Regions:
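Bacterial Sec-dependent signal peptides at the C-terminal "C-region" and cleavage site
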Residues: 1-21
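Residue-level recognition of beta-strand microenvironments
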Residues: 68, 107-108, 135, 152-155
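Surface-exposed, glycine-biased beta-strand/turn segments
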Residues: 21-115, 145
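Conserved, short, structured surface segments that act as functional micro-motifs
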Residues: 65, 115-121, 128, 139-174
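Active-site acidic-Proline motif in GNAT/NAT acetyltransferases
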Residues: 90, 135, 139
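Zn2+-dependent peptidoglycan hydrolase active-site motif and core
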Residues: 98-136, 161
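Intrinsic structural disorder/low-complexity segments
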Residues: 21-24, 124, 134, 167
Length: 174
């Protein structure tokens, strides 16, 4: 430490209490700075971990919107319905990616959505991927941002192959 460095240059004796006090204060300042640097590194790491855990990534290599979130004409039977996600054009078997780090809480069949994957992310967020042809992950699996999780398809109630994508926050579709 700094104390040892200075003690090699200027021997400390009981006759030099002021010098000893200065050295102790400098050691304390260095320790404080080290602690601040450590805390900043930890906060920065936490920020990056949090950002990767939010569903902010792209679920497909190319995003072409085919149906937006909100009210739309029903594809079957006429009338209007609230569309609770976003549909993206996808060719049969296009790779579908996790949009953030998380844990798979559903990987399986849903009557309307067909083959579906739901991932729980930090902060109460969940992402849902529906109408898949193939599922690469199982319930309980951990996934990372950009990891392939399945293949696009036309399972469930659909007019053709596409990816239905949803983001939920605290169980509310957004």
């Amino acid at each position: 430490g700094v104390y040892i460095f200075f003690s090699l240059l200027v021997p400390c004796t009981t006759n030099e209490p002021q010098l000893q006090q200065i050295i102790l204060e400098k050691d304390s300042d260095v320790d404080s700075l080290k602690n601040i640097i450590y805390c900043l590194k930890e906060e920065n790491y936490f920020l990056y971990q949090t950002m990767d855990s939010l569903p902010l990534g792209s679920p497909l290599d190319t995003l072409v919107l085919s149906s937006k979130f909100g009210w739309r004409k029903k594809p079957f039977g006429g009338g209007w319905q609230k569309h609770t996600g976003t549909d993206f054009l996808a060719a049969w078997h296009d790779t579908v990616y996790a949009t953030g780090n998380g844990k798979v809480i559903k990987s399986g069949w849903n009557v309307g959505y067909g083959r579906q994957i739901k991932i729980s992310h930090c902060g109460g967020y969940e992402s849902t991927y529906a109408h898949l042809y193939r599922l690469f992950v199982r319930n309980g699996d951990s996934v990372i941002l950009g990891q392939p999780i399945g293949r696009a398809g036309n399972s469930g109630v659909v007019t053709g192959p596409h990816l239905h994508y949803e983001i939920l926050r605290n169980d509310k579709k957004t």
